[in-house]
């Protein structure tokens, strides 16, 4: 029988392909997004030093919302707020191999509305 391809393995391959083309610096870090079934996570990463500068997720107490898309918008606003506290205004968006749709899009648009440029 033909087995169905594992969607997560395909996403990881796509993510590695994109990661070969983008990287973050201290002045313009990479905004990395990871989406699980229940939560969404965002990190600002300096790839030169290999350091996480700021992070936010739906597990943070500041994030609230009924739907997962509303929660993703809250994470986007929170990561933008934490970036502004560290004087970071420009980032490189890394969608993590996910389609720019739904929760990933909501996070990105909320981050843009709250002052991040990408």
UniProtKB/Swiss-Prot annotation:
SUPFAM superfamilies: Translational machinery components. Gene3D superfamilies: 3.30.420.100. Pfam families: Ribosomal_L18p. Keywords: Ribonucleoprotein, Ribosomal protein, RNA-binding, rRNA-binding. GO terms for molecular function: 5S rRNA binding; structural constituent of ribosome. GO terms for cellular component: cytosolic large ribosomal subunit. InterPro entries: Ribosomal_uL18_bac-type (IPR004389), Ribosomal_uL18_bac/euk (IPR005484). GO terms for biological process: translation. It comes from the Bacteria. Belongs to the universal ribosomal protein uL18 family. NCBIfam families: L18_bact. This is one of the proteins that bind and probably mediate the attachment of the 5S RNA into the large ribosomal subunit, where it forms part of the central protuberance. Part of the 50S ribosomal subunit; part of the 5S rRNA/L5/L18/L25 subcomplex. Contacts the 5S and 23S rRNAs. This is Large ribosomal subunit protein uL18. It comes from Limosilactobacillus reuteri (strain DSM 20016). The gene is rplR.
